[in-house]
A protein has these predicted regions:
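Active-site activation/catalytic loop segments of kinase-like enzymes and analogous catalytic loops
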Residues: 218-270
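Residues forming the ATP-binding cleft of Hanks-type serine/threonine protein kinase domains
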Residues: 11, 52, 64
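Conserved kinase catalytic-core helix
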Residues: 36, 67-111
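Short pocket-lining segment of the protein kinase catalytic domain that shapes the ATP-binding cleft
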Residues: 59-67
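Short beta-strand micro-motifs within the conserved protein kinase catalytic domain, predominantly
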Residues: 47-57
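Active-site acidic catalytic loop and adjacent metal/ATP-binding pocket
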Residues: 1-3, 7-8, 167-220
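An alpha-helical support segment within catalytic cores of ATP-dependent transferases
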Residues: 97-188, 199-201
Length: 271
């Protein structure tokens, strides 16, 4: 009303086989975590959020591009540097949040990253099976001709890596070290530009989509974000010290082995 613009996420349970139980849980968690952070770090989250329609609709403040907000990394290098530094500062601050175990369980903030990533056997499958390596190399070679130059270089790096078992073994060792890390830092757990609204004029930064929030090892949020920035073609060298190298290693096998799965088809899920 009164010309106010809001952002809305809705779960249509009729489209989902389990009546949307999981997705409704995500909306509930997103709202609850946002409200929790409004009390401690209000500058980092939406100013207003509310569940409606028996939990099927999540409404929140809208940070529209017409009001100066960016939902993609800035194209200007100097602004991009401010953007990256601001995000890194924010995720560092969020890591300090300490909550009682009862609240962690109530909000479903239990750790999962080290188990899901560090104990994933994707990298070991790649090392052990020459056919898997050949299939991966073939896939990347097929991608090469139609890629931008920067992505062609990245594909070539992966192709060369897949030919070097010693380097793959080192990555496997580092990934297993990630599984041993303490998960004592609060993390958004999906820190990427799609979930960030940045206002270059005011320097404000808002993180949205808190349904993956959890406790994780130190540097997890920065690592997620810097990988996303590199994917967008930004130079992240000044922030290499922020990376959790073992987490980065765990990404390699996790995503490579899953790239062999058949392409997703339209179905009864949201992603």
């Amino acid at each position: 009303s009164g010309g106010r613009t809001i952002f809305v996420k809705e779960v249509d349970a009729n489209l989902l086989s389990d009546e949307g139980e999981r997705e409704l849980g995500w909306l509930k968690k997103d709202c609850a975590v946002t409200r929790l952070l409004q009390k401690t770090y209000p500058q980092y989250v939406a100013d207003w959020t509310e569940l409606a329609d028996d939990g099927h609709v999540l409404m929140m403040s809208s940070y529209a591009s017409s009001d100066g907000w960016l939902w993609q990394p800035p194209t200007d290098n100097s602004v991009a540097e401010r953007y990256i530094s601001t995000v890194i500062t924010e995720v560092r601050e969020l890591e300090k949040i300490k909550l009682p175990q009862e609240l962690i369980e109530e909000l479903q903030l239990q750790p999962f990253a080290t188990e899901k990533l560090g104990l994933d056997d994707g990298i070991d499958q790649i090392i052990a099976d020459a056919d898997v390596r050949r299939r991966l190399i073939d896939n990347y070679q097929k991608l090469l001709p139609n890629q931008l130059e920067i992505n062609q270089r990245r594909c070539q790096v992966i192709i060369e890596l897949l030919k070097k078992r010693d380097e793959l073994t080192d990555i496997s060792v580092r990934a297993k070290e990630f599984a041993k890390q303490t998960e004592g830092c609060f993390n958004h757990s999906d820190v990427r530009s799609d979930n960030l609204a940045f206002n270059p004029q005011t320097g404000e930064l808002k993180l949205v989509d808190w349904n993956w929030a959890s406790y994780a090892p130190k540097g997890s949020g920065a690592t997620e974000f810097l990988v996303d920035m590199a994917r967008h073609g930004h130079d992240v060298m000044p922030w290499l010290g922020e990376l959790n190298v073992e987490m980065l290693a765990s990404f390699v096998g996790f995503y490579l082995i899953r790239s062999l799965r058949p392409p997703l088809k339209p179905g009864d899920n949201l992603r």
